[in-house]
């Protein structure tokens, strides 16, 4: 399973862990993915993985 949002395509970003001594090691920032059920146009439901920020936008636009 890929770590990518099914709607926006948001995926992992690359950055650094930075210690107090300013030593840097590579790390990945993962998107906050949630599995949700969505209703498709034909009336069927399907589980997709979307980012939490996408869920907030979907909730805002549905009202």
Curated annotation (Swiss-Prot):
Sample GO molecular function, one term = structural constituent of ribosome
User: Which GO biological process categories is it annotated with?
Assistant: translation
| This protein's GO CC annotations | ribonucleoprotein complex; ribosome
Residue numbers spanned by region Disordered:
1-20
Q: Which InterPro entries does this entry report, sorted A to Z? A: Bacterial_rp_bL28, Ribosomal_bL28, Ribosomal_bL28/bL31-like_sf, Ribosomal_bL28_bact-type, Ribosomal_bL28_sf
List UniProt keywords, sorted A-Z.
Ribonucleoprotein, Ribosomal protein
Under Pfam families, the record lists: Ribosomal_L28
What is the superkingdom listed in this entry's lineage?
Answer: Bacteria
**The family this protein is said to belong to:** Belongs to the bacterial ribosomal protein bL28 family.
Q: What is this protein called?
A: Large ribosomal subunit protein bL28
Q: Which organism's genome codes for this protein?
A: Campylobacter fetus subsp. fetus (strain 82-40)
């Amino acid at each position: 399973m890929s770590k990518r949002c099914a709607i926006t395509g948001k995926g992992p970003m690359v950055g650094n862990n930075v210690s107090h001594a300013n030593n840097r090691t590579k790390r990945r920032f993962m998107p906050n993915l949630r599995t949700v059920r969505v209703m498709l146009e034909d009336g069927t439901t399907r589980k997709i993985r979307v980012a939490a920020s996408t869920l907030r936008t979907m909730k805002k636009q549905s009202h």
